[in-house]
Regions:
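Catalytic-core regions of glycoside hydrolase
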Residues: 1-103
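Catalytic domains of carbohydrate-active enzymes that cleave complex glycans
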Residues: 1-21, 89, 105-166
């Protein structure tokens, strides 16, 4: 119903949604961010990509693995970008960046959420291994994206083949 209100008001407005995959919403959304593990099939994602619709993956208070919790293995933050790349998504949505609890330097819990779920950096711009690993994954993603773009322009079939293996 809400989508119809938006479409009836202005057909040019873009509609986005973050949540579990619902096939019935697919054609209605310009930008769909799927919860990791609740995503479309690879074939459905390829159709979204071919029609120019944005698709991203996100994690939040779940799933427990992979994630960016204080107790998560740091490599998970980097691995997520490789997963995003492998499945042809446009990017990764981190649901919270700086929602700090009262004393973030002493206690990373925020309400009932897992420790570290609500922030990736500490007050005052202090980084942490979780953020740095996520950043490394983003850099990896961008490097491969740029290499794919350059090899497509060059027509180098061998290089294109190697990049498809990633």
């Amino acid at each position: 119903a809400a989508i119809n209100v938006v479409r009836n008001h202005d057909k040019c407005w873009k509609i986005t949604y973050a949540g579990n995959w619902h096939k019935e919403l697919d054609g209605l959304l310009d930008d769909y961010s799927f919860l990791y593990g609740e995503e479309p099939t690879i074939a459905e994602q390829k159709v979204r990509a071919a029609t120019g619709r944005t698709s991203t993956v996100y994690v939040c208070c779940n799933p427990p693995i992979p994630n960016n919790f204080v107790f998560s293995p740091p490599i998970e933050g980097r691995w997520i970008s490789w997963y995003v790349m492998a499945y042809g998504y446009d990017g990764f949505l981190r649901w919270a960046y700086d929602a700090w609890p009262e004393d973030a330097d002493r206690d990373a819990r925020h309400g009932s959420w897992a420790a570290g779920d609500c922030y990736m950096v500490y007050p005052g711009g202090k980084s942490c291994i979780r953020f740095e690993k996520m950043r490394e994954g983003i850099v990896d993603f961008e490097k491969v994206r740029i290499l794919r773009e350059l090899t497509a322009q060059s027509g180098n079939a061998q290089a294109q083949g190697l990049l498809k293996q990633l």
